[in-house]
A protein has these predicted regions:
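Ferredoxin-like alpha/beta domains used as RNA- or RNAP-binding modules
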Residues: 1-106, 133-207
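Beta-rich strand-turn-strand
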Residues: 109-112
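Short, well-ordered loop/turn sites that connect or cap secondary structure elements
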Residues: 118-119, 138
Length: 207
């Protein structure tokens, strides 16, 4: 049965992001115009909004992309502030290192939402041990694989075939034949291809 992706498209449109960021193809959403908001358009819109509204929307955008609720998101921010470097960069890097996001980035599933379900259902191992916590933070050297008893599930084969041309971030390595991924480095901000202005989130929480 086809999935109803209209709510996703509407939410994306409201936040000014393309459904492709969420892993959805434009063709799957009739309510998406196909136009990606550029920075000039964003700047014009920002002038029409209050500073608070603009900052709040940016936070909502990141929460929506990664599927994180407010309490957990605040926890990531508080930790980001304590870490060396830019708080905004640290915030995104923590979110990027979530196991469900890594499963998505490796192409095991087309969306973060579906990848989170797969992790919750215990289909993945990290360094040979089953991990069913979507927020689990991966580190360099860790190996992420489909659990042996889950490898025969047709969904995984279909997903990997559909995502054969999926671009793997340079901080990850993937062996499609063996269905195994490896974290080779901590992601840098420039490795995170998301249309977000994280400094606005820092400004929001700094008030």
């Amino acid at each position: 049965m086809a999935k109803n992706r209209e709510p996703i498209a509407k939410h994306c449109k409201a936040l000014g992001i393309s459904p492709a960021v969420m892993g959805y193809n434009h063709d799957n959403s009739r309510s998406w115009s196909g136009k990606v908001t550029n920075r000039n358009a964003q700047a014009q819109t920002r002038r029409k909004k209050s500073e608070y509204a603009t900052q709040l929307q940016e936070k909502q955008k990141v929460k929506f992309i990664y599927g994180v609720l407010e309490k957990q998101f605040l926890g990531y921010y508080e930790k980001a502030v304590r870490m060396p470097g830019k708080a905004g960069d640290n915030l995104l890097i923590q979110l990027e290192r979530r196991l469900d996001n890594v499963v998505f980035r490796l192409g095991f599933d087309a969306t973060r939402r579906e990848a989170r379900q797969l992790v919750n259902h215990g289909h993945f191992t990290v360094n040979g041990r089953k991990v069913n916590i979507p927020s689990y933070q991966v580190k360099p050297g860790m190996v992420i694989a489909i659990k042996e008893s889950s490898r025969s599930i047709e969904r995984f084969k279909a997903n990997l075939e559909a995502n054969a041309y999926h671009v793997i971030p340079k901080w990850l390595d993937f062996d499609a034949n063996n269905m195994v991924g490896k974290v080779v480095a901590v992601p840098a901000r420039e490795d995170i291809d998301l249309p977000v202005e994280e400094h606005l989130i820092v400004e929001l929480y700094s008030k």
